[in-house]
Amino acid sequence: MARPWLSASVLITAVILLVDYLNYYRLRKRLGGIPVVGDASYFWRRIRWTESDTNFQKVIQHGYDTFSKKAKPFAFWGQHEDFILVLPPGSCEEVKHLGPEKLNFLQAVEDSYHFKLHTNILGRSHVDAVRQSVNKNMNQLHEIVVKKAEETIPKLFDDIAASNEPFAAFLTIWHLVHIVSASYLVGTEFCANEEYLQAIEYYCINVPNFIYGYFWVPVPLRRLYWYLSPQGYKVRACKAKLKTFIVPKIRETISAWQNGQKSSSYTLLGAMLDLKAQKGQIKRDPTAMTKAELERQIDIFSDEMIFTGFDSAGPVACMVTQLLFEALRDKDLTKALRQELKSALEANNGQWNVQAMNLTPKLDSFTRESLRVNGPTLLSVTRTVMEPMQLKSGLSLQSGSIISSPSWLIHNDEDNYENAHQFDPYRFYNPSTNAVTTKVTTASTNFLGYGYGTQMCPGRHLGIKMSQILFSKLLMRYDGEFADAKAGKPANIVTSGQVLPPYYAKVILKRRGI
């Protein structure tokens, strides 16, 4: 008996797999003769049973040792189902001045996460607002972070410390960072809004989780996965909930601005509004825009605010966690940092002000060393090629390709740093002058923690300052140890783009002096 449904199913499946394979072939052809590490046959790649999936650190190290060390490019198959082209060390000098019209970081983020499905991130208002406003308001931002940290840390950690029970450090620090960052991203009232905090944290976790499944399915089925999968629904529902909090705040801010009212406290939302006004995207005269255009701009505005929450908290949470972990495993370092902080505070009447934090060169060196060894970036200077170009080496870059630099491997290369695999908290500290030899945020071809060139992370100064304040507050208030004291600091998680602290690694804290 004929079974037409079975024949149709087989045919449809064959067509889907053929289209998916042809997409891979197209992407592979775009690479030309560039060698690929960790690649495998179509079937094993499709079910993600390759060496890249099981031991990516080994794969990327092999590519670096075999090709990068000989000034040659290589590529690997990323989790976004496309190749990432790893340029040879030193290529950063050639591309560092190229703007987003030629090499675009935000487009690379879009291509890697497909934010276009749910969030508009390609407008540059959030990036330009950070670049134009954060550094000149740094003193006020410093005060905001200190105040909110002093309010929040005891609430989150004192009961945990009193219980003497192990807890997942990263997850609690993650929550702390979201509370503190909300105060200067959207407004202090959001720090106490548990529904907003739950939604933004959920969004930040579920977007990467969704994308992992989205890119796992063959190309022709991805739109269906977005609309029909539980994971896609969770992202859509979470974003809709976030908009119920953020859109009214944007409307309120625009209305106050149109009426000539000015906020006494800095927020990135306010800075973005000023920038949008400069660009003519939002008008001070309410009658100068149609209702439809205003609604469109508010929708874009809210998307940019949501993405900023996604983009800003993760690196700081990782940094604070890594600093805490390194301090927990080195009691002498903990003692030295506490003494330095104590002296800096005494010199400033106990105030955690900018001047006090400027008197902590050991902390600066320690922070830079943690960035060198512990990420959070595995790759840096990541860009999507917007138009075909050729490097001086003769390497041709095709439009649509994603390029990057092997920053973490460069940081751990003995040719760049003596005893590179050893964590030395004083590597960038000069004891004879009691000063850092290189500032935490200074980039070079051998230090790419925050990128390089004109598209370096514009929020790096605030990110470092916030990380140091939160870590220092924890260090001065609590003693601690790893739950598994014998095992010590747990190994980092190395993914195809990041070096992360283990999310569930547990520590035990205790109030100092108690």
From Swiss-Prot:
Protein name (database record): Cytochrome P450 monooxygenase verB
Primary role: Cytochrome P450 monooxygenase; part of the gene cluster that mediates the biosynthesis of 11'-deoxyverticillin A, one of the dimeric epipolythiodioxopiperazines (ETPs) from the verticillin family that act as mycotoxins. 11'-deoxyverticillin A is required for normal conidiation. The nonribosomal peptide synthetase verP is speculated to be responsible for condensation of amino acids to form the carbon skeleton of verticillin, whereas the cluster-specific tailoring enzymes are involved in further modifications leading to the production of 11'-deoxyverticillin A.
Q: Which SUPFAM superfamilies does its entry note?
A: Cytochrome P450
State the superkingdom. Answer: Eukaryota
Q: Could you cite one Gene Ontology molecular function of this protein?
A: monooxygenase activity
Q: Which GO terms describe its cellular component?
A: membrane
What is the enzyme's main class? oxidoreductase
Q: Which Gene3D superfamilies does the UniProt entry name for this protein?
A: Cytochrome P450
Similarity-based family: Belongs to the cytochrome P450 family.
- Membrane topology type: Single-pass membrane protein
Disruption of the gene: reported phenotype: Completely abolishes the 11'-deoxyverticillin A production.
Q: Which residues form a coiled coil?
A: none
Q: What is the lineage of its organism?
A: Eukaryota, Fungi, Dikarya, Ascomycota, Pezizomycotina
Source species, please?
A: Clonostachys rogersoniana
